Amino acid sequence: MNAEYGVGARLPAKTSLIVIRRRRGTSPQCWTHKSKESCMPTKETSNSRRGSAATKKNAFCSFCRKSYRDVGPLVEGPGDVYICAECIDLCQSILDQEQRRRGPSKSLFSDIPSPRSIVEHLDNYVIGQGSAKRVLAVAVHNHYKRLSNGADGSNGEVEIEKSNILLAGPTGSGKTLLARSLARMLNVPFAIGDATTLTEAGYVGEDVENLLLKLLHAADFDVEAAQRGILYIDEVDKIGSTNGNVSITRDVSGEGVQQSLLKMLEGTVANVPPQGGRKHPEQQYIQLDTSNILFICGGTFVGIEEIIRRRLGHRTLGFGEGANVRNEQTPGELVAQVQTEDILKFGLIPELVGRMPVISYLQPLDLEGLIQVLTEPKNSLVKQYQALFAMENCELEFTEEALHAIAKKAVDKGVGARGLRGIMEDVMLDIMYDLPEQEAGKVYTIDEAIVTGKQDLFKMPTTKSA
């Protein structure tokens, strides 16, 4: 209707917009729009006017069955069919969504970001992990350059295969944040799935196709957009056996799930259930080609240091004072030398590891790195709490000793950067409780004594004794 009619599309010739108004002491009057310029009552005979008034008086939307008294103006069509503005908006949104789903998607990139610019973007959100950032930047740049040069990634006679990525590292080192920051920069659909919830077909649990359903949700069911998105599969190390022993009972969430992931990672046309799970066998499946989806798998791989130590040789050779002495390397130094054979000995099958040729290990954050996480990123915890204080017209500052004490708590607990929020919430709980009652316009400073609980930021009011 045109904007003059307030609905958004052109009215058919036989369609009229009726507005039913009640004047004081009179019955409802029906007004009909015959043109843009005219908004006058239609000329009717007395008999037709009485019949029309009786009909219009009880007019209701033919879609939602609401009366004109509840929804306002109604659009009248042939055969006494009416529709309200709310239903028109709903129908328009449904048509727009269907058009986006069926229509051609927008081009992927006008200019593919260079690996250097990708690393610079990641530096704004993730502290440290320079080696992992470079590996990710090169792999992502080559992947989307492959897509922009052809849907099948081919250039003449040379077909460029995609390179999925495996990120290994301790909890709180930034694996998920790296993948999410990449998707934010590239403006592509991004979804996170958990490998521990997956089981083989026929067993209680989720199928591997449910991971693709999350990507479809992120793409608003735009199949073309989802087929070039990024899917991050977390806890992939949990679907492998760490010692290689064969269990007496069937492992329905281990090697069988790895076998199910093979074709999806390599590239296949998967049948995705739009309602998820196996509870709706009658549903129609959505076909999704995974050939151009970038898969990033992540896991902690706890204990892989000993596998690397055995491969490198944990005792020195020779005679004399230094013979048969354990070669003590830090876990960070060991995992920096991770190779494909170490991942295989950890429990992942060779076929799965072969489909993730890019392997990078993230180092655990030390004390200085955690302090940087608290202050430097754009959405750092310190900046978030400063914004909360600004909403109360106050300012918040942290001393270096306070930041050091917060970071040391995270190091002692071994929770990495992910545990910083929990520690900050514990430190700031009483402060945020009393903040709305404090004087505005003041500057409050958090020091080490407040972090350790030896001192309160606000002076508690003294209560009068009875």
From Swiss-Prot:
Tell me which domain of life the UniProt entry assigns to the organism this sequence originates from. Bacteria
GO biological processes: cell division; proteolysis involved in protein catabolic process
Residues binding ATP are 170-177
Q: Where does Zn(2+) bind?
A: 61, 64, 84, 87
Q: NCBIfam families of this UniProt entry?
A: clpX, PRK05342.1
Q: Which PANTHER family match?
A: ATP-DEPENDENT CLP PROTEASE ATP-BINDING SUBUNIT CLPX-LIKE, MITOCHONDRIAL, ATP-DEPENDENT CLP PROTEASE ATP-BINDING SUBUNIT CLPX-LIKE, MITOCHONDRIAL-RELATED
The entry sums up its family as follows: Belongs to the ClpX chaperone family.
Q: What is this protein called?
A: ATP-dependent Clp protease ATP-binding subunit ClpX
